[in-house]
Amino acid sequence: HAIASQKLSLWYGTFQALYDVDLSIREGLITSMIGPSGCGKSTFLRSVNRINERLGYVRIEGSVHVMNENIYDPHVELIQVRKQVGMVFQRPNPLPISIRDNILFSHRLHAKGGGEVAQGTPDEIVEQSLRQVLLWDKVKDCLQRKATELSLEEQQKLCIARLLPVKPKILLMDEPCSALDPKGPEAVEE
């Protein structure tokens, strides 16, 4: 399985957000989680790449296996989890640096640590990633522009493009179109 949780429970302080979640997702499948607002979908996704642990008041019991490895085992390095499990959030979160540097940021970080990353010159990596999200033609002449100056749709596409050079095995998308105008989802889905 690509993802398998076993008896996963999570608390924010004294509030229990997840209760004994057992879920298995096979590799290679596109899977959707559907449920009412506040039922724990985002909390579960954030548990799969350990973003919840940034908050000092989160406690987790149970296990989450990604590609058959318990990502909460003490020997598992966070940087390797984030390389395997990319995430796109509800609101775009480009780094406040250039469009070009946004694409190359995680590639540089993960290339140093070994493992599979996109090959090629930095310019080739940037172009390929932006072409894959249909953003290249729009930004190719302004790659030094600050990423935060792009429209919301463009920022969200950039956030997806930023993951591609790292070649994550799993891509989590937490309602990536919810903050966009009505035409935005179509552009991101393309």
Predicted regions and their residues:
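Conserved ABC ATPase "signature" region
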Residues: 66-70, 119-141, 190
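Conserved ABC ATPase signature
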Residues: 146-150, 154
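Conserved catalytic motifs of ABC-family nucleotide-binding domains
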Residues: 167
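ABC ATPase NBD Q-loop/coupling interface
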Residues: 63-80, 144
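Hydrophobic anchor residue at the start of the ABC signature
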Residues: 160
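Catalytic Walker B motif of ABC-type/P-loop ATPase nucleotide-binding domains
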Residues: 171-174
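ABC-type ATPase nucleotide-binding domains, specifically the catalytic core motifs of the NBD
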Residues: 50-56, 74-76, 93, 101-121, ...
